[in-house]
Amino acid sequence: MKYRLVLIDDSQTALDMMAHVLAEAGFEVRAMSSLRRFVNPVLDWKPHLIVTDLYMPEMNGAELCQWLRRQVTTSRIPIVLCSSAPDEELAAVARSVGADAYLSKLAGLDALPERLNTLCDEILW
């Protein structure tokens, strides 16, 4: 199965690199550097997973996760928080806002497709 992912990160460089690596690995990817155009693509495209950076200027990933959990149409979409913050901090935030998982950016891009594939398999099936 080809998983559909929405990537959200305010760093265009990080976003482009993640999107490229994941697309090369067979994921369908929609990448967004701003939350302004976020809602309609999510509702229309029905992604299997949302991967969002934790620290962003408009609305951080934790706030986005909480907002998505309150919406009927998005409350069941798995959400992964992604950050270069220490694992303990990232894990605590993910638990507190109802994220399904967290990923450290420090692990590098090479491991990203396998980790997200495993998460999709575990969360969705």
What is the role of each PLM region?
Residues 56:
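Receiver (REC) domain active-site loop signature in two-component systems and cognate sites
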